[in-house]
Amino acid sequence: MKRPIVVINPNSNQSVTDGLGECLARFNNNKSHPIECVTLKNGPFGIESQLDSDSVILPLANFVKTRPDAGAFVIACYSDPGIDTCRSVTSQPVFGIQESGVLTALCRAERFGVIAIADASVERHRRYMARMQVINRLA
């Protein structure tokens, strides 16, 4: 049975989803776990604030509940919005790109760094890293 890895763009910007699909295409040769990129159509155009991040939590969880066929989910937004809520509504693995990126970096070095795309995002990312208990390893 094919169990896709569902990569969810939680904003409504289809060009972001298309870009994700293009970047992931070279990894999409696994016949048992194809990669499927989807757009959360009722999300904001971009996740630029805490309000934007919070506004997609329930729509993300509701979407995850509609996909019992998925082998895993990836929340493709660096804020990892709704990761805990999504994990609470499925038995499938749910990965966030911030959590996955930071933890992978820490497997390779004692400290890590992050380049944010907007100043307004920095504090939100720092709060999440503190919650992950890795803020003291931020370079």
Which role fits each region the language model picked out?
Residues 1-59, 117-139:
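N-terminal glycine-rich anion-binding loop in soluble enzyme alpha/beta folds
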Residues 57-110, 114:
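Glycine/small-residue-rich loop that forms an oxyanion/phosphate-binding "nest" at active or ligand-binding sites
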